[in-house]
Amino acid sequence: MDEPTFWTLVESAKAEATPALSNQPEILQKKLEALPPREIVEFDRIFTQLHHAAYRWDLWAAAYIIEGGCSDDGFADFRAGLIGLGRDAYYAALTDPGTLARQPTRGVDFSNEEMLYAARQAYEAVTGEEMPDHGLVHPREPRGERWDHATAAKKYPELVAKFGVR
């Protein structure tokens, strides 16, 4: 599987999901179950690479503003939800996290923990076995510069305007 095919699967599941995107992981899992096991493994590898690439302080600051606080686990869920928004939203946010202010938010929870498990659950449903380890190691620390609450709000005024500071 290549990255364009990965994004086609993610975006088609998003298009079929309810506006809140809460059922997107379930739809994605069903799409993955129609693929050969090696393709499911490759999907998970690409997902993991993208998830790791988004482990950045600037995105964590954006998540903190959007979610009204954001723990380490919450940030993992946020990054999974960011991938679920699709290719354009994902890469725009990596370039400028402030672009997340342009995303529709009515009823949408940016964090989508279940996206983390869609491929693994699909693999288990198809093979009856656990997903093999692809050897990708999560970064020890986020990339970029640390932030505090005041600097995060100043850096992303468009997010503060849309989501407030909670």
Please annotate each region the language model reported.
Residues 3-6, 25, 40-47, 71-75, ...:
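Short runs of predominantly hydrophobic/aromatic residues within well-ordered alpha helices
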Residues 29-69:
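A glycine-rich, hydrophobic loop/mini-helix early in the fold
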Residues 89-122:
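An exposed acidic His-Trp-rich patch
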Residues 22-26, 58-64, 92-95:
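Short coil/turn segments at secondary-structure boundaries
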Residues 64-94, 100:
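Hydrophobic/aromatic-rich, well-ordered segments within soluble, folded domains that form packed cores
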Residues 1-39:
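N-terminal leader/targeting peptides and immediately adjacent processing regions
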Residues 7, 128-166:
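Long, solvent-exposed, polar/charged low-complexity segments
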Residues 14, 36, 52-55, 83-87, ...:
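Hydrophobic/aromatic-lined pockets within catalytic cores
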